């Protein structure tokens, strides 16, 4: 039986005016998590974040990408997950050992910041259009924090469940759509059904089978399914922009100490190498690059 691995399934509960999304990641998650040897607690947060980014892209009506980014002062310094409307994902975490077996959300640090950013694709010569909202750390876990975000920022009652292990990252989301004259107990009834889902079901069941098992009495209707895969948006042009931002003085100093500069992408491992001439040509036209005698 196909288990809809590496897919995002959107659905409607027509009987209650509730929309939802189900994400299952296997190969994609294994590719992301294999780049760095993550402690289990860090991998768990990263897997949940990657799954959440796919869930959230399900309701985006623009051509672009959605990212979840956290900067903390605790053991986990950075958490980043991104999904595009084309179905490509990437993710990364930076942490500081030793890492405990369990990290409560409250231990991310008092000055921690987590943001959800939506970026609309634009022409290369135009500045990207971004929309950003902040996620609080007052919840018990990541899924609850995202639920509070949608409740407060989007005014959409939302339920989310997220799980990850070494093999898979999965998630389920339901949202009550705005509509007047709906029975007040519709949403309560759907939540009761939602609360029965177990991690083992999300890991093992086919998407259609899981949705039928949970919501067959609520006229569940699958809208579509999007294939998901790992892909990185790094490029030589982006690396050049980052090097230029360092400034000419730092570039010259680096090139005095090294024959060339090699930049590795932490997401995919791609290496970008720049010779002395290539590094300096980022600041001057190639024909006028001044070469120091010490750089011969």
Residue ranges, per PLM feature:
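Interaction interfaces in information-processing and related assembly proteins
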Residues: 2-224, 292-296
């Amino acid at each position: 039986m196909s288990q809809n691995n590496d897919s995002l399934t959107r659905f409607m509960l027509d009987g209650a005016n509730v929309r939802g999304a189900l994400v299952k990641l296997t190969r994609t998650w294994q590719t992301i998590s294999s780049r760095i040897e993550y402690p289990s607690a860090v991998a768990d947060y990263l897997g949940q974040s990657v799954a959440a980014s796919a869930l959230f892209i399900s309701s985006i009506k623009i051509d672009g990408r959605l990212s979840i980014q956290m900067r903390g002062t605790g053991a986990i310094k950075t958490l980043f997950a991104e999904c595009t409307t084309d179905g490509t994902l990437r993710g990364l975490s930076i942490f500081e050992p030793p890492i405990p077996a369990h990290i409560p959300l409250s231990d991310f640090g008092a000055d921690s910041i987590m943001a959800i950013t939506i970026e609309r694709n634009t022409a290369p010569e135009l500045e990207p259009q971004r929309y950003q909202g902040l996620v609080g750390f007052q919840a018990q876990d990541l899924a609850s924090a995202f639920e509070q975000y949608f409740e407060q920022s989007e005014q959409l009652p939302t339920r989310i469940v997220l799980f990850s292990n070494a093999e898979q990252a999965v998630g389920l989301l339901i949202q009550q759509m705005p509509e007047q004259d709906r029975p007040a107990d519709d949403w309560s009834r759907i939540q009761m059904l939602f609360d029965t889902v177990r991690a083992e079901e999300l890991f093992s069941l086919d998407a259609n089978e899981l949705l039928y098992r949970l919501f067959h009495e609520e006229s569940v209707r699958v809208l579509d399914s999007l294939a998901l895969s790992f892909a990185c948006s790094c490029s030589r042009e982006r690396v050049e922009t980052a090097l230029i931002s360092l400034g000419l003085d730092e570039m010259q100093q680096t090139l005095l100490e090294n024959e060339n500069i090699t930049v590795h992408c932490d997401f995919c491992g791609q290496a970008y190498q720049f010779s002395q001439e290539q590094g300096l040509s980022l600041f001057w036209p190639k024909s006028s690059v001044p070469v120091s005698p010490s750089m011969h």
